[in-house]
Amino acid sequence: MSQALPLVTRQGDRIAIVSGLRTPFARQATAYHGVPAVDLGKMVVGELLARSEIPPEVIEQLVFGQVVQMPEAPNIAREIVLGTGMSVHTDAYSVSRACATSFQAVANVAESLMAGTIRAGIAGGADSSSVLPIGVSKKLARTLVDANKARTAGQRLKLFSRLRLRDLLPVPPAVAEYSTGLRMGDTAEQMAKTHGITREQQDALAHRSHQLAAQAWAEGKLREEVMTAYTPPYREPLSEDNNIRKTSSLADYAKLRPAFDRKHGTVTAANSTPLTDGAAAVILMTESRARELGLTPLGYLRSYAFTAVDVWQDMLLGPAWSTPLALERAGLTMADLTLIDMHEAFASQTLTNLKLMASDRFAREVLGRSQATGEVDESKFNVLGGSIAYGHPFAATGARMITQTLNELRRRGGGFGLVTACAAGGLGAAMVLEAE
């Protein structure tokens, strides 16, 4: 049994999250078609600094992530520093933890703050599913390398003459796990079947997600944490997420066919999060540094945990594994939480995690714990909707969830919030936040 691990600096300062911002999220090939992730990252960090009125030289480190990486800009963090007017001396490096990438970025900045190497930093992530690294076949790639080494035109022609037409076809990015060949949707189907999650339950969760997200926008709750994005050719700005279904009915979801298991499946495009473009970032500081600058934090990072599970079975169970660890390290239980925000990769994955969190048997036989993490109160769960509605730019989702949860906690008078996500490769992440 782990003991509570307070996240404080050597001087006893808490880790403060003073500000957070994101772009509107856009479905693949819509508002951000042709806009690379690095530009989305520059956009959000530049605007975040402008709104916070924090002098750029105050920021000593920027940790940023991108899951679908572009070969021409492998260190997106450094490109953002150089493209936003920040000091060229700002330390910057990139991280990748699949769908939990900005969770990792936040943890890394927090660790720098606790170590005392910095007093303020930015963490976040950006991804584009509209600007993708389209590759070439292995045979063509090898031929190009060999041709570069060839000394004569004849040698080059001989190499290229061995290629067939199919070798010249472009190769799109893989959508399956490298180690298993399974797609995320295949795992979502497996989890639904194994744990008895019905199509009706999945559709109901997806419908709820869209309803609550639409309501959050209608009530103006997201206005301050989402910037207006201007992208080439600068004709129409984007000020809201464009994936949210504002007028759908539950009956509409039943009309869609399964997307992965065509005959017997229950996972559809409507009860899954779509491919999405966007960026999000947060500013973290030591509590004393925020006080020196006259800033009121949105809240504080109380604890975090990262876990890993098998990739062949129940690969998306990260939240059920990481949540009890994060709660334990925070010295809290599920009952102490005011809000719980779980990344909705698929409705089946979300419902399976909720089901197993409440299971004593799962706790004993799988986690090796004496009792269940706890049943999640629906009135506390994803109260502003989730990723099924907002979309999921892989590296940006964690920062969205953190900012959104802290702002909602403040509207409710403070308390503790949990944000948690599954990720490719069987990874999981959870963070406990505190607002006053």
Curated annotation (Swiss-Prot):
This is 3-ketoacyl-CoA thiolase. Transmembrane segments: none annotated. The gene is fadI. One of its GO terms (molecular function) is acetyl-CoA C-acyltransferase activity. InterPro entries: Ac-CoA_C-AcTrfase_FadI (IPR012806), Thiolase (IPR002155), Thiolase-like (IPR016039), Thiolase_acyl_enz_int_AS (IPR020615), Thiolase_AS (IPR020610), Thiolase_C (IPR020617), Thiolase_CS (IPR020613), Thiolase_N (IPR020616). GO terms for cellular component: cytosol. Keywords: Acyltransferase, Cytoplasm, Fatty acid metabolism, Lipid degradation, Lipid metabolism, Transferase. Its EC number is 2.3.1.16. Belongs to the thiolase-like superfamily. Thiolase family. Pathway: Lipid metabolism; fatty acid beta-oxidation. PANTHER family: ACETYL-COA ACETYLTRANSFERASE, CYTOSOLIC, ACETYL-COA C-ACYLTRANSFERASE. Gene3D superfamilies: 3.40.47.10. It is found in: Cytoplasm. Catalyzes the final step of fatty acid oxidation in which acetyl-CoA is released and the CoA ester of a fatty acid two carbons shorter is formed. Heterotetramer of two alpha chains (FadJ) and two beta chains (FadI). One of its GO terms (biological process) is fatty acid beta-oxidation. The active site is at residues 99, 392, 422. It catalyses: an acyl-CoA + acetyl-CoA = a 3-oxoacyl-CoA + CoA. It is an enzyme of class 2 (transferase).
